[in-house]
Amino acid sequence: MKAIGFNRPLPVSNPEALLDIELPEPELRPHDILVAVQAVSVNPVDVKVRAAHTPAAGQYRVLGYDAAGIVQAVGSEVRHFKVGDEVYYAGAINRQGSNAQLQAVDARIAAKKPRSLDFAQAAALPLTAITAWETLFDRLDVNKPVAGGANALLLIG
């Protein structure tokens, strides 16, 4: 399969910072879904991992954590997804990323894509939504549920 990866942390201005590569199709673990990636987003974690990680000799690292796509196969323990489902997710930092045609993702961190969103919109949500949630409820300790929250608008910045 085609992917975009790197084999050493070069400055982004270097033409070899990101490379078009060919990789074998990912193998599924029991809880995985195989996703044909339709859209991805770029997050600060992509930049940080690329700057700090050097793959083993002859290996490539594929970046990309937020993505949306179509399920192509399911692992033996997957119960909530089937082939053809449209999904979105934030992948795992310890696995190959979403900047590839196919990505193996733990189904327990994926969700069915809302019908009201296209693939690009869905791919833009996972890490930003997690960041907003953690900021509001873990850092600022906003009580859940917020009384009158349905009528509130939070503007930051």
Give residue ranges: language-model regions.
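Short structural boundary motif marking the start of a folded domain
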Residues: 1-4
